[in-house]
Curated annotation (Swiss-Prot):
Family: Belongs to the potassium channel KCNN family. KCa2.1/KCNN1 subfamily.
Biased composition (Acidic residues): 65-75
Top-level taxonomic group: Eukaryota
Topology in the lipid bilayer: Multi-pass membrane protein
Region annotation (Disordered) ranges: 1-90, 514-536
Entry protein name: Small conductance calcium-activated potassium channel protein 1
Species of provenance: Rattus norvegicus
Intramembrane segments: 342-362
Catalytically driven reaction(s): K(+)(in) = K(+)(out)
Regulation: Inhibited by bee venom neurotoxin apamin. Inhibited by d-tubocurarine and tetraethylammonium (TEA).
Oligomer and partners: Homodimer. Heteromultimer with KCNN2 and KCNN3. The complex is composed of 4 channel subunits each of which binds to a calmodulin subunit which regulates the channel activity through calcium-binding. Interacts with calmodulin.
Gene Ontology terms: cellular component: cytoplasm; neuron projection; neuronal cell body; plasma membrane; Z disc
Biological process according to GO: potassium ion transmembrane transport
């Protein structure tokens, strides 16, 4: 029986089939060869094959193709080889962009739900009722946007967990699921899930009227309790501001912050905005809070305000404004606990904003460092000029007193007393100005801020470093000069012996028996004695 019958194929040599040495054929779906089924011994034999042949593929593959396959295996997420630094950085950058995009979409759908909720609430009070089809359709739209928002929030936190794994080099996502993170995700999902559900549901709302203290009961919609908490979705705006901030996205800023142990979070971005444009931030925050609080009070007071005082939007804005400014005229008061709670939060927020406004105005009215230096220089110049004028007045009055008392035949006592009075005034003025100048100098010394001290310290450090470098260079030169002097001293010490050897060479040693034998054997070599005349 020939080898072809054993191989199961025509024209294929023995031992080259698919099952030879446990190697399987190439899987067309995966695009790579299947793993061998043999033990480690055969795998070692496959690794020891020549570089020109690929053990995992057909013969004739070049080494370049093998290297390309290895690079593809490294890029695959399921490969056993660890990813390179460039691959991790690229993956991290892509996750950053995806997280930013998800945050933008979440803010869009969150704001869309709030706008539709406000529209449905206003239309249900004046255009149609809660039982109408339009109200049901708008509530279904709110529910759809809420479901999409919840999905985006989950995807956002999934990207955050992936970023945590990339930053810390972890493989299991359960490592990142701490109790704090789980609680935060649960709270965020609960806040975003609150919305008015489709349908018409009512409850009995009891309250006590403000002026008459008469109990009041009214049938209110459940949508009121589910619509007001939807404004908590505005926290997504702070997240978008953080992710789109240039300080957060700039790699150099993040590196400097990491070196200085500064955490780039929403609090840091808010402080930065308050430093750059405090007036704009306070204005936008105050107006937004004013509008939201006024609409919330209107919704809370609608069912118990028969005279339509606080249930009117303009009346609610007036109530919120006088509460925000801590004035409290008392002409309008809320009836329900919901309205009272909103007014309480508005008063606390107004007190904080008032303090911030005072701080911002005080900072704007304060002179800058350059303006302080110019002002102090001008005041010092004026004080110096006034002191010189006072000293000149003292000398002048002294001369006039001497002139009217000694250089005239008949002194005029009234004129003398007048000049003496001016003399004393000039002395007191000079002393006072000198005291003012000393105090001005103290103020100038105290005006040196920490920035000036830090700058002076840095300048002193640079000067000391330069002096230290020059001292080290001078010490190196002195060491080199000392070594050269040592060499020169050794040369000078050896100079007399060298001169003596050059003038009077040493005589050869006295010939012994061995020298005589050598002289006898070699007649050309002879020995001449050295006389005293040769040495001079």
């Amino acid at each position: 029986m020939s080898s072809r019958s054993h191989n199961g194929s025509v024209g294929r040599p023995l031992g080259s089939g698919p099952g030879f040495l446990g190697w399987e054929p190439v899987d067309p779906e995966a695009g790579r060869p299947r793993q061998p089924t043999q033990g480690p011994g055969l795998q070692m034999m496959a690794k020891g094959q020549p570089a020109g042949l690929s053990p995992s593929g057909p013969r004739g593959h070049s080494q370049a193709q093998e290297e390309e396959e290895e690079e593809e295996d490294e890029d695959r997420p399921g490969s056993g080889k660890p990813p390179t630094v460039s691959h991790r950085l690229g993956h991290r950058r892509a996750l950053f962009e995806k997280r930013k995009r998800l945050s933008d979409y979440a803010l869009i759908f969150g704001m869309f739900g709030i706008v539709v909720m406000v529209t449905e609430t206003e239309l249900s009070w004046g255009v149609y009722t809660k039982e109408s089809l339009c109200s049901f359709a708008l509530k279904c739209l709110i529910s759809l946007s809420t479901v999409i928002l919840l999905g985006l929030v989950i995807l956002y936190h999934a990207r955050e967990i992936q970023l945590f794994l990339v930053d810390n080099g972890a493989d299991d996502w359960r490592i990142a699921m701490t109790w704090e993170r789980v609680s935060l995700i649960s709270l965020e999902l609960a806040v975003c899930a609150i919305h008015p559900v489709p349908g018409h549901y009512r409850f009995t709302w009891t309250a006590r009227l403000a002026f008459s203290l008469v109990p009041s009961a009214a049938e209110a919609d459940v949508d009121v309790l589910l619509s007001i908490p939807m404004f908590l979705r505005l926290y997504l705006l702070a997240r978008v501001m953080l992710l789109h901030s240039r300080i957060f996205t700039d790699a150099s800023s993040r590196s400097i912050g990491a070196l200085n142990r500064v955490t780039f979070n929403t609090r840091f971005v808010t402080k930065t905005l308050m430093t750059i444009c405090p007036g704009t931030v306070l204005l936008v925050f105050s107006i937004s809070s004013w509008i939201v609080a006024a609409w919330t009070v209107r919704v809370c007071e609608r069912y118990h305000d028969k005279q339509e005082v606080t249930s009117n939007f303009l009346g609610a804005m007036w109530l919120i404004s006088i509460t925000f400014l801590s004035i409290g005229y008392g002409d309008m008061v809320p009836h329900t606990y919901c309205g009272k709670g909103v007014c309480l939060l508005t008063g606390i927020m107004g007190a904080g904003c008032t303090a911030l406004v005072v701080a911002v105005v005080a900072r704007k009215l304060e002179l800058t460092k350059a303006e302080k230096h110019v002002h102090n220089f001008m005041m010092d110049t004026q004080l110096t000029k006034r002191v010189k004028n006072a000293a000149a007045n003292v000398l002048r009055e002294t001369w006039l007193i001497y002139k009217h008392t000694r250089l005239v035949k008949k002194p005029d006592q009234s004129r003398v007393r007048k000049h003496q009075r001016k003399f004393l005034q000039a002395i007191h003025q000079a002393q006072k100005l000198r005291t003012v100048k000393i105090e001005q100098g103290k103020v100038n010394d105290q005006a040196n801020t920490l920035a000036d001290l830090a700058k002076a310290q840095s300048i002193a450090y640079e000067v000391v470093s330069e002096l230290q470098a020059q001292q080290e260079e001078l010490e190196a030169r002195l060491a080199a000069l000392e070594s050269r002097l040592d060499v020169l001293g050794a040369s000078l010490q050896a100079l007399p012996s060298l001169i003596a050897q050059a003038i009077c060479p040493l005589p050869p040693p006295w010939p012994g028996p061995s020298h005589l034998t050598t002289a006898a054997q070699s007649p050309q070599s002879h020995w001449l004695p050295t006389t005293a005349s040769d040495c001079g």
